[in-house]
């Protein structure tokens, strides 16, 4: 069983912002596998389904980004999911737009949502899909809560689809295979 968590902020004002990349990827997976994310529990919205023979829980925390760990730990404990089977999808400023990076473990890298998840799980050993949003020319908060330009959006739509495939690959083939397949790929217009 896998817990697939997309990080983001709830509310219409945050829809399609850079910081809501995780929510967007989870929505793509939900659509592909006909999973309704309409149940409220674990301080978030979730739905259950299958990727092949593997049961998955899709979770969108409603705690706001910086407290995402509260939601993740509640769902993980309820379903008794191993940390190695918790996949977290989120935006990453250290990666260029058009790229993603799959990792099996690692530090928060300055991302407060991941930092909070690491604190609550008491471990940094969980897979993640880091989606590049590029470096800001402006205030970081304004940047991550801002929307992509039209040109960037074209690239991001393709990266979101690729990120969903990377998550599915982790479930079906394992982290190493997903890393080999998706790390280093760059989407351009």
Curated annotation (Swiss-Prot):
Annotated GO biological process: protein quality control for misfolded or incompletely synthesized proteins; rescue of stalled ribosome
Entry keywords, A to Z: Cytoplasm, Hydrolase, RNA-binding, tRNA-binding
One Gene Ontology MF term: tRNA binding
Reactions the enzyme catalyzes: an N-acyl-L-alpha-aminoacyl-tRNA + H2O = an N-acyl-L-amino acid + a tRNA + H(+)
Database matches in CDD domains: PTH
Cellular compartment(s): Cytoplasm
Coiled-coil region list: none
E.C. number(s) listed in UniProt: 3.1.1.29
HAMAP family (UniProt xref): Pept_tRNA_hydro_bact
Family statement drawn from the similarity comment of this UniProt entry: Belongs to the PTH family.
Complex formation: Monomer.
Name of the featured protein: Peptidyl-tRNA hydrolase
Protein's organism: Clostridium botulinum (strain 657 / Type Ba4)
